Amino acid sequence: MNECKGMESHLTEFSGLVSKNCIENTTVPHTAYILQVHKNPDQVNRFIDQIISEEQADVFVHIDKKTHNELCRKILNNPNVEVLDENIDVKWGDISQVDATILLLKKVLDKQKSYDFVCLRSGQDLLVKNGFRDFLLNNKNKIFMTATHIERSNSDVAFQNISWPKVARKQYNVFHPFRVFRRIIMRLYGWGFNIFPNPYKLPEEFSLYHGSSWFCIPLNIARYIIDFLERNEWYYDAFKNALCPDEWFFQTIIMNSEYKSQVVNNNLIYLRWDQTFKNRNHPITFTLEDINSIESSDQYFARKFDQNFDNSVIEYFINRIKI
């Protein structure tokens, strides 16, 4: 595992899933999209336009506290779109990413609407393949998230078993002593020395699972997550000083539940990780040159895009793809 690199599954065949051509059903699935946003409101609005066509979806937007006042009035004014008044200062590698997701899930549940799915996406995603509405309709009750079992003996468990100092839970995009410090802590853990032990370890009967932050889950799974957290405060404590807890938190809850069998190891998002030293904890920002790889991925979404880096690739998918 490469620092905070998520295990994004780029599967192109969904084993056991139902093709949209297998079932004819005119019922429209109702989806709650929960978006984490921190920049480019115009681009965010174009993504929202993609996913709320035919009013089959509601969109809940959390704007990072650092840019909330600047962006909140620029998000699309639409009865199907709600910008949360509450905002969290989201930081890389920190529990704040989990906090923002929990806040969004609670907002969806507070609506008391019968959504079929709750899909967590970022403001730099785009829909890149037609037919997502029919795909959801024909795959109800499936949980779309990446989840890889990590044995307790694996050194990557250091992400959760260490109570990471704040300086190690920050993002450094250049060579920095604290980046080296983080590597040293990981190496020592692998040798059996945990110099910052987490006092809130998970029970031994809990299996650890790692994957991407992004998911698409049925409403009852969202309710299960919130109910579980309210009944088991110790679980949150076990991750509050972990490194990149958003890549473990929800997978571990679900994969230790009775709903484990519903998980499809695919979050329906295509991305590619940057291989440079400076940006290797980030997915690359797509350009027009990436269109072939995006389309051949057979995923419904892709990230990340940036209108200030290459707007033409955004135009390409906006003009061709509908929900």
Model feature map: region roles:
Residues E3-I323:
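ER/Golgi luminal nucleotide-sugar-dependent glycosyltransferases, focusing on the catalytic module
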